[in-house]
Amino acid sequence: MSSRLSYVNVDDPNFYEFIDEKYSKYKIPPKQKTFKQFCFPSKYEFQIPQQFLAEYINPKTPYKGLLIYHRIGAGKTCTAIKIAENFKNKSKIMIVVPASLKGNFRSELRSLCADDHYLTSKERSELKILHPSSDEYKSIIKVSDDRIDKYYTIYSYNKFVDLIKQNKINLTNTLLIIDEVHNMISETGTYYESLYETIHSAPDNMRLVIMTATPIFDKPNEIALTMNLLVRNKQLPVGPDFVSTFMDIRYNSKGPVYHVKNMDLFKEFVKGYVSYYRGAPPYVFPKSELFFVRTKMSDLQKTVYQKITGKEVKQTKVRDYVNENISNNFFIGTRMISNIVYPNEKVGLKGYNSLTDEDLTIAKIREYSPKFLKILRKIKRCNGTVFVYSNFKEYGGIRVFARLLEFHRFKNYEFNGSGPRRFAIWSGDQDPIYKEEVKAVFNNKDNEFGSKIKVILGSSSIKEGVSFLRVQEVHIMEPYWNFSRMEQIIGRAIRFCSHKDVELDRQLVKVYIYLAVHPDIKMSIDERMMKMALDKKMINSAFEKALKEAAIDCELFKNANVYPGEQDIQCEQ
């Protein structure tokens, strides 16, 4: 116990001073590594934040829990492993991740992040030359998995929550690590309730590490729910109490106007429970340009839009859109019509079935979907690969756009294999092996100009854990009511070192977000959705800034978190 006496409690007035002094060797210097050192490293090295956190959450320290708010290129998974490796002979290690990322966590344990503990250097060399379907390859992976399973229990969210409900999760003397924790946060969701109760009924010798690059995905109140998993004695207010404590809302003729308040109080609540690291510096990502493409509705679109919106207005009453729950059916007909109107003026399958090949000519599509026409023309002109996204997988977006591409002499990769003018659809109901194949073909250097697959068409299943390389253009067919979703989509194409091996003038991604506008209406549904997203982004950014300033490592990592020309972070003292 004596070693713990030399540590300062998180609510001690001198806590930040203690951290800065005790861990001063982890202060990131002003001079950063170069683009080449980041993207073409000559040897494997741990990043400074990974080293610091493995020292901070450690069997010899008293610190029980932490939110690791680290962004893209920070190596969050390896950070978790570096922390866990210090506990593996002393505690149980339980990992909870989205089902789609379970394999990714095991791969990271097989990497140099965990040294040669779960895969020897000889085995690593053999895997590089063996085919993944071969018996030898599978045998090496099986042996490696057995080594991992001796120390790590890895659950998907669903499995973990099922076991909680069956009373089969025992967190005594456990290090619990939850990745992409924002997926489990919701006032009304069953995941959160089960998670909260299990964590708060766990014995004092449990430690909790939760990780996310987006601590507020939709509503500001999510950060209170997240932090309340970590803090035992001073819970943040939630729901309407959170709003009244930390936000001012005024209403004028244009709708609500939002401001934050009591940020010092908010920082007091989260003090000692947040680590913030921006991740890789801006110069290792491709540059990006964002364009809002305001597309005037056709006469037919205007007529159908007014008819549908008249019905939907009666069903939809959302006043405070930053804090209220919004259903996926929010103005769904109006939103689909803003993308495409069908010849029989119906929406959904009935509308789609009325669309014939003659309706896909340039002259006709100009009347049915000015948006689609603009996207089609940009794809044809683009000298490289393109990622097209819609929230609508079927009749208001991807499915019908695929038909348009086929009519204009593009071919579906699934049925025609690779070649020029190919597109591939990426959706949740496809075989994971097929998606891996698409990604491998698309991301190969020899596809830089789209000679194998030019266009990826994606819907909401593409949000997490997917990287596309060397993309030149991203087209988002319609806005969504939170900007995190749009940033997540854009982030599929703007990746850490994703354009490292292309010419300098091609290290740029042009991002287009399409808004259908109605000349006789002050604000169309697309414009309204965009305003909602930007208002939320502004208010959420204020809470995120407070998290950054209250982070335990604010001073240590400041040189890597703020770059010239950016808004400064004032670290708490």
From Swiss-Prot:
Family from the record: Belongs to the DEAD box helicase family. DEAH subfamily.
Nucleotide-binding recorded as keyword: yes
Annotated localization: Virion
Keyword Glycoprotein attributed: no
EC number: 3.6.4.13
UniProt cross-references to SUPFAM superfamilies, sorted A to Z: P-loop containing nucleoside triphosphate hydrolases
Residue span(s) of domain Helicase C-terminal: 374-551
PANTHER family (alphabetical): DNA ANNEALING HELICASE AND ENDONUCLEASE ZRANB3, DNA ANNEALING HELICASE AND ENDONUCLEASE ZRANB3 FAMILY MEMBER
Catalytic activity: ATP + H2O = ADP + phosphate + H(+)
UniProt: ATP binding residues: 70-77
Keywords of the record: ATP-binding, Helicase, Hydrolase, Nucleotide-binding, Virion
GO CC list: virion component
Species for this entry: Acanthamoeba polyphaga mimivirus
Pfam families: Helicase_C (PF00271), ResIII (PF04851)
Protein name (Swiss-Prot/TrEMBL): Putative ATP-dependent RNA helicase R563
Biological process according to GO: DNA repair; replication fork processing
Sequence motif DEAH box, location on chain: 179-182
GO molecular function terms attached to this record: ATP binding; ATP hydrolysis activity; DNA binding; DNA endonuclease activity; RNA helicase activity
Domain called Helicase ATP-binding: residue spans: 57-233
